[in-house]
């Protein structure tokens, strides 16, 4: 499946630039714009430093999760971007990658973005997909919730790939990542 003409369904925030350290914390909840963007336009938003999250119906919180068709994984340690790019799963399904604002040469930090084959309209399903991909890549465990903010990085030059997760793989991820009752 090719992402070239697939729209990314997210919310963006043009006033949260890079890591937004300090400043007005109300921006984390308010001011999000629900958009549908071609993957190249989404990459441009990230390259402007703009934050993104799932679309919301109101302020940004899990109870207001509306929909999304991507899952993002923060890699803060354990592998380099080059290692991630050569991973067989990424070779088949990775849609976009970029270095995060916290990236430094001695400790590479980057974000993997996977476009999904359909809209996720349930916060529980979004968490399941996020959880499964975080398990697969040993991603930052604090980034699994459905209303998570992902910060852009001005001048990060995101790399876009013409591939995405398939329906079959999405079903597997939903099964792997679903909450377990103990």
Where are these regions (language model features)?
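Generic beta-strand structural signal
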Residues: 108-110, 148
């Amino acid at each position: 499946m090719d992402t070239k003409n697939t729209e990314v369904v997210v919310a963006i925030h043009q006033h949260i630039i890079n890591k937004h350290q300090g400043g007005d914390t109300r921006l984390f909840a308010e001011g999000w714009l629900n958009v549908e963007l071609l993957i190249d336009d989404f990459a441009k938003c990230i390259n402007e430093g703009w934050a993104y999250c799932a679309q919301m119906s109101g302020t940004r919180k899990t109870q207001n999760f509306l929909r999304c068709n991507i899952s993002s994984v923060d890699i803060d340690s354990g592998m380099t971007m080059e290692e991630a790019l050569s991973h067989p799963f990424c070779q088949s399904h990775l849609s976009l990658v970029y270095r995060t604002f916290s990236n430094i040469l001695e400790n590479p930090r980057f974000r993997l973005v996977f476009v999904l084959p359909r809209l996720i309209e349930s916060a529980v399903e979004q968490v399941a997909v996020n959880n499964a991909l975080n398990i697969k890549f040993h991603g930052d465990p604090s980034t699994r919730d459905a209303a998570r903010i992902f910060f852009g990085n001005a001048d990060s030059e995101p790399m876009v790939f013409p591939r995405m997760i398939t329906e079959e793989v999405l079903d597997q991820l939903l099964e792997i990542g679903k909450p377990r009752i103990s």
